[in-house]
C-alpha cells in the first residue's frame, strides 16, 4: 500500500490576533466569511469562530483569505516572526507555484527547499529568493541551512586569501561583488594582527572577540546592499 504524503504543517496562527483584528474592524463572523468569499474561499461563520477559539487552524489558502478580509498583513496573524521559507512565502501571500515562478526555479525544486530547509540555488536565485520572500540576508542564510557553510568560508578567509572566498560566499550572501570584496578584505584585515618579537599584541591589535559570522554581518551592514542585512 502506498503511503500517503505527510499532511502539511499548519500555518503559524494566533487566535487572539484574529479576534483582535476582527473586533477592531467591528466585523461579525458573517461579514468576515463574506470578505473571504471575495477572495475565492467559501466557509461558514463557525469556521471563523473555531479559528478564534483555537479549536482548529486555517489552511494556507484560508489563512491568506482571512488576512485579506481583515485588511491586515498575514504576518500579523501568525503570532510570531516567520521562521522558515513557508512562513515567509505565506506572509507574502504567495502560493508555492507563484514563488517558484518569481524566483526562477522549478516548482519541484522550491517544494523540496521548503520541505527540507535545504536550498541549492545559485547566487542569482538566492538573491531572487530573498527579494521575492522579503527575507533579510542574515535570516536568508539561516532558513536555507547555510550557516555552517558560511562559517567554513569565513574561517578559510581568515586562514588564507579572502579573494578565494568571494565566489563561494556570493552563493550564500547575494550582495554586489564590490561590496562583498570590500567586506571580506576588511574582515580578514582585522585578523591579521601584527606581532612583534618579544611582545604581546596591544589592546588595539587584539583580534575581534565576536564569532566570525557576527563580525562579518557587522561589517557588511556598514555597506549599502539591495537586500537588508
Residue ranges and their predicted role:
Residues 1-25, 72-92:
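A short, Lys/Arg-rich alpha-helix, primarily the initiator
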Residues 18, 29, 45, 63, ...:
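Helix-turn-helix DNA-binding elements, focusing on the entry/boundary residues of the two helices
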Residues 22, 33, 37, 67, ...:
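The alpha-helix within a helix-turn-helix
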Residues 26-49, 93-112:
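Short alpha-helical DNA-recognition segment
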Residues 29-80:
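Acidic (E/D-rich), amphipathic helical modules within compact regulatory domains
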Residues 59-76, 123-141:
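DNA major-groove recognition helix of helix-turn-helix/homeodomain DNA-binding modules
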Residues 78-101, 142-174, 223-227:
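Short, charged recognition helix plus adjacent turn
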Residues 157-229:
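Charged, low-complexity intrinsically disordered regulatory/assembly segments
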Amino acid at each position: 500500500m502506498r503511503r500517503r504524503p505527510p499532511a502539511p504543517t499548519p500555518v503559524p496562527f494566533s487566535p487572539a490576533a484574529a479576534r483582535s483584528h476582527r473586533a477592531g474592524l467591528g466585523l461579525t463572523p458573517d461579514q468576515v466569511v463574506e470578505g473571504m468569499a471575495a477572495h475565492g474561499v467559501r466557509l461558514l461563520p463557525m469556521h471563523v469562530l473555531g479559528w478564534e477559539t483555537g479549536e482548529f487552524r486555517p489552511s494556507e489558502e484560508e489563512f491568506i483569505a482571512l488576512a485579506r478580509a481583515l485588511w491586515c498583513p498575514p504576518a500579523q496573524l501568525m503570532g510570531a516572526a516567520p521562521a522558515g521559507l513557508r512562513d515567509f512565502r505565506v506572509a507574502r501571500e504567495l502560493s508555492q507555484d507563484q514563488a517558484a515562478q518569481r524566483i526562477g526555479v522549478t516548482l519541484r525544486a522550491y517544494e523540496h527547499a521548503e520541505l527540507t530547509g535545504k536550498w541549492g540555488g545559485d547566487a542569482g536565485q538566492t538573491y531572487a529568493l530573498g527579494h521575492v520572500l522579503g527575507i533579510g540576508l542574515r535570516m536568508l542564510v539561516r532558513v536555507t541551512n547555510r550557516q555552517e557553510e558560511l562559517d567554513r568560508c569565513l574561517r578559510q578567509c581568515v586562514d588564507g586569501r579572502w579573494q578565494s572566498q568571494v565566489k563561494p560566499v556570493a552563493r550564500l550572501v547575494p550582495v554586489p561583488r564590490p561590496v562583498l570584496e570590500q567586506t571580506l578584505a576588511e574582515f580578514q584585515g582585522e585578523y591579521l594582527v601584527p606581532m612583534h618579537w618579544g611582545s604581546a599584541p596591544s589592546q588595539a591589535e587584539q583580534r575581534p572577540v565576536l564569532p566570525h559570522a557576527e563580525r562579518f554581518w557587522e561589517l557588511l551592514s556598514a555597506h549599502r546592499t539591495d537586500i537588508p542585512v
